[in-house]
Amino acid sequence: MDKTWLKQYPAGVPANIDVAQYPSLVALLEESFKKYAGRMAYKFMGKSISFAQIDDASRALAAWLQTQGLEKGDRVAIMMPNVPQYPVAVAAILRAGYVVVNVNPLYTPRELEHQLKDSGAKLIIMVENFATTLQQVLAAVPTKKIILTALGEIGRAHV
């Protein structure tokens, strides 16, 4: 198979990765947060967010998640579009020892119910804009803990 996309890679970017380089995804994140702490990770709504800020926010969220009675390997759903809270939530869930369940924020109530039942997610982190969809299925799903966040905020949420 001709891998035409490799021609687009910048010089020095390998065609393959060494999957044994990191023992876990958390180890990869930890190294990246440390290595790029002073760098901007992204800009959102005119605000720059550094790798250090993502690191700090995800550590705080991971610590809080571990107080919620979940067990290692439990599923935690994330229902967000491409917003700064998403990488914070992913890093926090992984750091806490849980499994990330991505949920399309455009799901209908029927689709959301199916995914939450199928995954067994016990907690969901979501942008408040989509809370009405969850509200319609909450009685039928195993997900009983909800963290709401708003567009443009990072580092605080409503539980």
Where are these regions (language model features)?
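Flexible, low-complexity linker/hinge segments
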Residues: P14-P23, I154
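Conserved AMP-binding/adenylate-forming core of the ANL superfamily
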Residues: A20-Q21, G38-V83, P87-A91, T108-E113
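Short, contiguous pre-domain boundary segments
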Residues: L6-N16
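Structural core segment of the AMP-binding/adenylate-forming
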Residues: T67-Q68, R95-H158
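A short N-terminal helical cap/helix-turn-helix that marks the beginning
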Residues: D2-T4, V19-M40
